[in-house]
């Protein structure tokens, strides 16, 4: 064993099975790995590492380097974040030899890279065919499906990879109906007093009421059996952008699984007029909330995508004859 004298970084040679990386006593095939004894559990397979330096170039925290033997290693750091490990796992993802593991995650357990010839048309179709869903079946989405989608949101981009977005969820339609009735009753009582959801006039409110007869079963949550509310604290990362990105990714995840989803701001305006009921959500006051996402199994299936076109006057290309001084 060789230990560093510096901070939380050390080196420990570990003999493991070449085939499945079990401890040596379980298998005769030997492979040597170097375990960096630090908070990130950064592990380099020194036999597989070819010293290409790709991990060094993609590390946003700048804490990876090649040692004199041209093997990847991690520098000491005091805490995760700006001047330490960002927990992005770019090193694990970029290594062409699969020589890097981190946080106990091994490269062989990662999802394979997508074939762009397959992914591009699938993504194009997904974006063109997703619709805001305003009518839902009175049916719960399986909890395993919801949990899987929430887990996928850990891959959504966010400022500094701080992973500050939290998710408040109603995943049972009975509970959702209960909450809907509470909010709706108060909203109607306030409207009778001339107090309407924030940002809505009497005329706009009456329009929403009229549309309940055709477009949506209820003006608040479109009859959705579930809602998801992404929110993030101010003062950390980029809460506004992070919340919007997480919400957009969740909507696409719903679309890819045959679920309908709709991004709602009207209920936020209603809840602003009833702080006691808003408090039932248990979302901290210093958190940014940009939307409430209703989702579930769609009552109406669409037959095809729309044929929207991008107006060219919405695209502004820049070109400079001389670089700015």
Give, region by region, the residue ranges found by the protein language model.
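Acidic, surface-exposed loops and disordered segments
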Residues: 33-325
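Short, basic, low-complexity termini and linkers enriched in Ser/Thr/Gly/Pro
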Residues: 2-4, 30-32
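Short linear segments in intrinsically disordered or otherwise low-structure-confidence regions
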Residues: 11-14
């Amino acid at each position: 064993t060789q230990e560093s004298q510096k901070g939380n970084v050390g080196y420990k040679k570990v003999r493991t099975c070449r085939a499945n990386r079990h401890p040596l006593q379980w298998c005769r095939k030997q492979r040597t790995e170097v375990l960096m004894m630090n908070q990130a559990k950064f592990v380099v397979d020194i036999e597989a590492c070819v010293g290409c330096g790709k991990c060094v170039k993609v590390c946003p925290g700048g804490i990876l380097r090649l040692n004199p033997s041209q093997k990847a290693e991690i520098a000491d750091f005091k805490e995760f974040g700006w001047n330490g490990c960002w927990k992005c796992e770019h090193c694990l993802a970029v290594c062409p030899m699969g020589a890097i593991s981190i946080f106990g995650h091994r490269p062989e357990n990662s999802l394979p890279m997508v074939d762009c010839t397959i992914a591009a048309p699938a993504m194009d179709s997904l974006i063109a065919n997703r619709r805001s869903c305003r009518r839902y079946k009175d049916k719960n989405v399986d909890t395993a499906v919801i949990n899987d989608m929430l887990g996928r949101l850990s891959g959504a981009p966010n400022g500094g990879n701080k992973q500050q977005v939290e998710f408040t969820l109603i995943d049972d339609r009975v509970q959702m109906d209960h909450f809907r009735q509470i909010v709706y009753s108060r909203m109607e009582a306030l409207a009778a007093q001339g107090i309407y959801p924030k940002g809505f006039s009497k005329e706009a409110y009456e329009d929403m009421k009229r549309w309940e007869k055709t477009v949506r079963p209820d003006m608040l949550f479109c009859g959705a059996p579930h809602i998801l509310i992404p929110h993030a604290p101010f003062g950390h990362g980029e809460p506004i952008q992070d919340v919007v990105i997480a919400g957009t990714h969740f909507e696409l995840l719903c679309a890819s699984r045959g679920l309908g989803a709709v991004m709602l701001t009207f209920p936020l305006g209603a809840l602003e007029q009833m702080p006691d009921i808003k408090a039932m959500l248990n979302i901290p006051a210093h958190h940014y909330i940009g939307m409430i996402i209703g989702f579930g199994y769609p009552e109406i299936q669409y037959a095809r995508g729309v044929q929207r076109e991008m107006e060219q006057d919405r695209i502004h290309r820049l070109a400079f004859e001389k670089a700015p001084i």
